[in-house]
A protein has these predicted regions:
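Anion-binding and metal-coordination hotspots
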Residues: 1-189
């Protein structure tokens, strides 16, 4: 099929306006092809830098005065680049298939992206039980609190070196573990 570049840009604007509906449709349609395992969901956030001189200016609506934040903003870059960045967060299911994503200006806190994207994603699921898995940078108290309600839980990595002595001892303790199948104690070997 032949189509104009301008047509694809117009389509992108239309798609952006219905992004959440489209993601829900993709989830449901793919679930009919391959059973999606959303019992464990992994989230991570990264950023992309642009080799430009200045960040984008925010857009101010002349009629309403509403300010829309531009995407390419100065923020903390994982590549340590002194360039404007855009942040992207991605949820994947237990098989590594993407579930949802968010794109935010580079100067936004990535932890806010996690909870807002998860709330949207949960609305798409029939089975609301899930375990949120992320690295330590995405395990704030607010995120852990959010994932302690309902039938949600969380696993967030933590540096063993930064733990208190009693917790370090507990981590390396080989006793006190129980099998889920029959609740019998089983030492780690």
């Amino acid at each position: 099929p032949h189509y104009l570049y301008e047509s694809s840009l117009r389509f992108m604007s239309l798609l952006a306006g219905h992004f959440d509906d489209y993601i829900t449709h993709l989830y449901e349609a793919s679930n009919s092809i391959i059973r999606r395992d959303t019992s464990v969901c992994y989230f991570d956030c990264t950023n992309y830098y642009f080799e430009i001189e200045t960040a984008d200016d925010d857009y101010v609506d002349e009629v309403t005065g509403e300010v829309s934040s531009a995407l390419r903003k100065y923020g903390i870059s994982k590549q340590h680049q002194p360039s404007p960045i855009v942040q992207m967060g991605l949820f994947i299911d237990a098989q590594g298939i993407p579930l949802s994503m968010c794109i935010n200006p580079g100067n936004h806190n990535e932890q806010l992206c996690a909870t807002s994207t998860e709330k949207k994603m949960i609305r798409s699921f029939r089975d609301k039980r899930l375990i949120y898995c992320a690295d330590a940078g995405l395990g704030s108290m607010d995120i852990r609190r959010f994932n302690s309600f309902g039938s949600r839980a969380f696993i967030v990595t933590q540096s063993i070196k930064k733990l208190s002595n009693p917790l370090q001892k507990a981590v390396f303790n080989h006793d006190g573990y129980r099998l889920l199948s029959n609740n019998m104690q089983k030492p780690l070997t």
